[in-house]
UniProtKB/Swiss-Prot annotation:
Binding site for Zn(2+): 188, 197, 200, 203
Record: residues binding ATP: 8-18
Family statement: Belongs to the QueC family.
Keywords per UniProt: ATP-binding, Ligase, Metal-binding, Nucleotide-binding, Queuosine biosynthesis, Zinc
Alphabetical list of InterPro entries matching this protein: QueC, Rossmann-like_a/b/a_fold
Described function: Catalyzes the ATP-dependent conversion of 7-carboxy-7-deazaguanine (CDG) to 7-cyano-7-deazaguanine (preQ(0)).
Disulfide bond residue pairs: none
Protein name: 7-cyano-7-deazaguanine synthase
GO terms classed as biological process: queuosine biosynthetic process
Catalytic activity as recorded in UniProt: 7-carboxy-7-deazaguanine + NH4(+) + ATP = 7-cyano-7-deazaguanine + ADP + phosphate + H2O + H(+)
Names of required cofactors: Zn(2+)
Domain of life: Bacteria
The organism of origin for this protein: Erwinia tasmaniensis (strain DSM 17950 / CFBP 7177 / CIP 109463 / NCPPB 4357 / Et1/99)
């Protein structure tokens, strides 16, 4: 039996990964992390989506100690969420240091226990938001460290790594779940479900990608299929 663990936040990217995993694996588990995020609604959204999509099990793990160590506008009310600024440089205030190191490692431990072969994450380098822990180089390095530390060949899969946001929308549409992704996921840094606030960087990236896909659905779909091997 093919088992996978999806690192699941209830946002656009991880929900798209979950939808695909349910098509490609016999048994899918989700792991969501409570890291003291300021918008607790994302945990509720993740629980609702995992239940409605029919995953085998959904674990919410407490890693709130991360909030004590890593200050970020996603975890601290006194650090404002910045509006989208294409000229911004350096690490954004929304970066949570060590978050994906913790998430992927804990998900790997869970995968080890249930004898899953893959950990799936929505990390993406193409629409790079300044997060070093979303880079392909980082994921591969951590995957190697996990396998060495556990003496087991686990795979950290990143189905969206080389897709832009328009192609991520196309992938959702390929699996006939674009409306669910658009209206029921929570990607917004200000905690607004669906199309979000429209002002933060996450909402801007999501809306721009949807617009690009809707303008050229056939060509974007073909490019997504070429990149993912779904053609």
């Amino acid at each position: 039996m093919k088992r996978a663990v999806v690192v699941f936040s209830g946002g656009q990217d991880s929900t798209t990964c979950l939808i695909q995993a349910l098509e490609q694996y016999d048994e899918v588990h989700c792991v969501t992390f409570d890291y003291g995020q300021r918008h607790r609604a994302e945990i509720d959204v993740a629980q609702q989506l995992s239940a409605s999509l029919g995953v085998r099990a959904h674990k919410v793990l407490d890693v709130t100690m991360l909030n004590e160590l890593a200050a970020s506008s996603l975890t601290r009310d006194n650090i404002p969420v910045p509006a989208y600024d294409p000229s911004a440089s350096g690490l954004p205030s929304t970066f949570v240091p060590g978050r994906n190191i913790v998430f992927f490692t804990f998900a790997s431990i869970y995968a080890f226990q249930i004898e899953a072969e893959a950990i799936i994450t929505g990390a993406c380098e193409t629409d790079f938001s300044g997060y070093p822990d979303c880079r392909d180089e980082f994921v591969k390095a951590l995957n190697r460290a996990v396998n060495l530390g556990m003496a087991r060949e686990l795979r950290i899969e990143t189905p969206l790594m080389w897709l832009n946001k328009a192609e991520t929308w196309a992938l959702a549409d390929y699996w006939q779940q674009l409306p669910l992704i658009r209206h029921q996921t929570l990607t917004c840094y200000n905690g607004i479900i669906g199309d979000g606030c429209g002002d933060c960087a996450a909402c801007h990236l999501r809306a721009r990608g949807l617009d690009q896909y809707q303008q050229n659905p056939t060509s974007v779909m073909l490019e997504m299929e070429r990149k993912t091997g779904l053609a």
